[in-house]
Amino acid sequence: MSVYGLQRLYIGGGYVDATSGKTFDTFDPATGELLAQVQQASAADVDRAVASAREGQREWAAMTAMQRSRILRRAVDLLRERNDELAAIETRDTGKPIGETLAVDIVTGADVIEYYAGLATAIEGLQVPLRAESFVYTRREPLGVCAGIGAWNYPIQIACWKTAPALAAGNAMVFKPSEVTPLTALKLAEIYTEAGVPAGVFNVVQGDGSVGALLTGHPDIAKVSFTGGVETGKKVMSLAGASSLKEVTMELGGKSPLIVFEDADLDRAADIAVTANFFSSGQVCTNGTRVFVHRSVKDAFTQRVLERVKRIRVGKPTDADTNFGPLVSAAQLDKVLGFIDSGKAEGAKLLAGGTRLTDGHFGSGQYVAPTVFGDCRDDMKIVREEIFGPVMSILDFESEDEVIARANDTHYGLAAGVVTENLSRAHRTIHRLEAGICWINTWGESPAEMPVGGYKQSGVGRENGITTLEHYTRIKSVQVELGRYNPVF
């Protein structure tokens, strides 16, 4: 018997049964308890969802921007009213501490919808005079039906981030959440319907990567917004281009550097480093896992980090006092433990953690201790590859030029941070770092107003911020001739 029962698809403003006859299970990573059986979408189901979205999009786009804005604002109110209920589901599905999901996941998702609801009426074209009796004007028109493919680490937040600009601009979206954490996207669909979003404008199809491929290759999808790993992102981009030259937005992986200079407030730097590595049990794409510390302060900094790691409260995610929960799945646990073994084998010095936690109630969950490695080298696997778990690598450096070159020596470019009391050096360093999201003397906040996305193989395009709205529209140029037409022939 599962906690939440059978989960169906959400198409055309309500729940429908999948035609595949297949289901998959989702489990509580803290206890191993079966949370739900989820119906897997078939190709026919994806076609049905896209057809429903096309129909709903025409009605949605025909509304005024002010009407769409009001409906989205109602959805925001409903999200906030149901914050505690949604946070409880998210905690069971992801293993995140309840204090985290209550304060972050739904709150930040609602903030982004509210932000774009406010911008819906600000979508404008241009008027360009050519001569006395002729001018050009432009219209920003919706793309049509977009596909959203979510990651497992921030299920409802990612669904909000992807739907908000799409819907504000007059598009519809067919969304596929990760099969690892599939529950809260369905609740968002319920909320949009209750708020007044027309049937079909937001549909949810469940399943593994094969369902994502069906969406990415569908001829009636105009744009794909994907969050996930680099290798999968490359496949998405290839299929999107080969099928119908779809537009793409992709937020992919990272191996982000955090640079601590010799003049840094070391207590502040240690607080930042611990947050940048262990928030959400290290399952955050922007994690600052390569911690470069000036050699003169490395020992003092490391001592402060280890003191803070000892204060991390690992426990049941449903306990209010817990601030560090399990990894999302057994597969992710195995992956992280493999990286830890690699760090030990390659000569990194294990300073904290490094083991699976199995005592008591930990034994039934996917828990790994917060892990810190010292004496790391740039060529180590734990330094070069994305782990997506609670593993910090500390490296030392001597000069500014050296650390910038080493920080940039990666095919990732998602995030970077600098801790220093010298603001001139802070800005100078940040401007030379090849990363799309940067922080000075802080880490991790991504407000609705801030465009987020990566350089290099960490992504294409941006989410959030004003400019993202433009990428959910296409420009139509119109010339108007008021005077006499001068024929060529």
From Swiss-Prot:
Q: Which residues bind K(+) 2?
A: L245, K456, G459
Question: Reaction catalysed?
Answer: betaine aldehyde + NAD(+) + H2O = glycine betaine + NADH + 2 H(+)
Q: Which residues form the signal peptide?
A: none
Top enzyme class of this protein? oxidoreductase
- Recorded metabolic or biological pathway in which this protein acts: Amine and polyamine biosynthesis; betaine biosynthesis via choline pathway; betaine from betaine aldehyde: step 1/1
- Cofactor details (free text): Binds 2 potassium ions per subunit.
* SUPFAM superfamilies recorded: ALDH-like
Which InterPro entries does this one have?
A: Ald_DH/histidinol_DH, Ald_DH_C, Ald_DH_CS_CYS, Ald_DH_CS_GLU, Ald_DH_N, Aldehyde_DH_dom, BADH
Q: What is this protein called?
A: Betaine aldehyde dehydrogenase
Instruction: Name the species this protein comes from.
Output: Burkholderia ambifaria (strain MC40-6)
User: Taxonomic classification, please?
Assistant: Bacteria, Pseudomonadati, Pseudomonadota, Betaproteobacteria, Burkholderiales
